[in-house]
Amino acid sequence: ALPICVKRGGAAALLFVVLTLAGLPLLAGGRGGLGLLSGPSVGFIIGFPIAAFVTGWMMERVQMNVLTSSFIAALTGGVIALYIPGVIGMALVLDKSLLAAFGLVSAFVIGDLVKVIICGFVTQAIYRAQPDKVLSRA
């Protein structure tokens, strides 16, 4: 959602969730269907369009250079805004504390932080090559 607008990023992520819940095998392992709503990843599924919206919203509002704006937007939307509903959903489904649920997903945090860094550099490269392809923050 970094190089595209809030509405398009959020809508694309929402469409992905709707198609997945409709049964298309779009998740890892070919998973899809309404049964996902009763599994431990329900919060991440619900949080996916929220994360895309927050990422685009942050990219529009953070008034710094593209690299820094991208890092902040990807961290805020792609990690924080995704992990909050994800951990809450996992805690509820598994009947665990929030801390215990976070412990279950903590192994993924480092990888997601690496993706934040990569995303920032990719967005910066796109901006340098084709500035009109990256979300305007003016």
Task: Indicate where each model-derived feature is located.
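Interfacial aromatic-anchored transmembrane helix boundaries in multi-pass membrane proteins
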Residues: V17-A51
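Internal catalytic-core helix/loop-beta-alpha segment
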Residues: G43-L75
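Membrane-embedded alpha-helical hairpins and interfacial helices in multi-pass inner-membrane proteins
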Residues: V62-R137
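Central hydrophobic cores of alpha-helical transmembrane segments
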Residues: A11-L19, A73-T76
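Alpha-helical transmembrane segments and their helix-entry boundary regions
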Residues: G9-A13, L36, I45, S70-F71, ...
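Alpha-helical transmembrane segments and their lipid-water interface positions
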Residues: A12-F16, L24, A51, T55, ...
